[in-house]
């Protein structure tokens, strides 16, 4: 229950943080798509732990194995299974958490729902689950780029109260990947890195905002009323660990404007209907309008920290916990490829649905 995402392009993730491995089964991928292990690995490398001093020190290569669905470099149209084996596991670091609940983590709610949980690194609630999403997202990105020229770029917009002035319409992947925090503004990137360094030394954590832009998205993706494109984007992004908020276009700031100020006026560009502004964020009436889709996701501070906090054990007795283990002082740098993956999965699924419904007879 709750482990499968999508309608026509369906992904099912599996595995746990300190188990044998994690992975994904992708069903509905069209045949004859050229895809390599290296292309998928490149996305996983952006997500993997231990990539810099401001991420978790857990050392995993996250090397992916394509078990099925790809032959001689092309997809078969059959289920694609991808596996990443866990190597650097330390379940003993979490022994204390077998009985004690981490504040703001999934420990207590998993116990309340299932009556049992894998306490080793959070099990299924760990961010390692997102390996499968990023692997599937690499394939979705390839489909979107090849079919429609879609480009998806996410980046760190804000860490705590440091918000970088970034134009999503011009930002490049090279700018994003030019530093370890994945903020395309070099001056703010230095400040963000320094802040995360300090928080790490304090055995604490901080959160922030990832912004993502999808360019060249075809018009017509999304379906009213319950399958609106922004609704599915929100569901996909908000299903990522540590997310606490979602915005598209003007978002909450749009509530401060009048209708005249907020409306995106239309004009014709060589017969193509465009908008003068893009406060709608590329989606109107739940359907893409051809403008850049711009979304933002709020990520809370990492729940597992080394500072002492009040909590209770499974018996309901009060205790103090200073968590052990290896954790990100800030999830934002590694969340960037995760957000890109979820946006890609949603857009790819809607692209296939749109082609099936609206272009069969045209």
Curated annotation (Swiss-Prot):
FMN binds at residues 124-126, 285, 300-304, 326. Its cofactor is FMNH2. It holds the Pfam family Chorismate_synt. The keyword NADP applies. Homotetramer. This reaction introduces a second double bond into the aromatic ring system. This is Chorismate synthase. The gene is aroC.
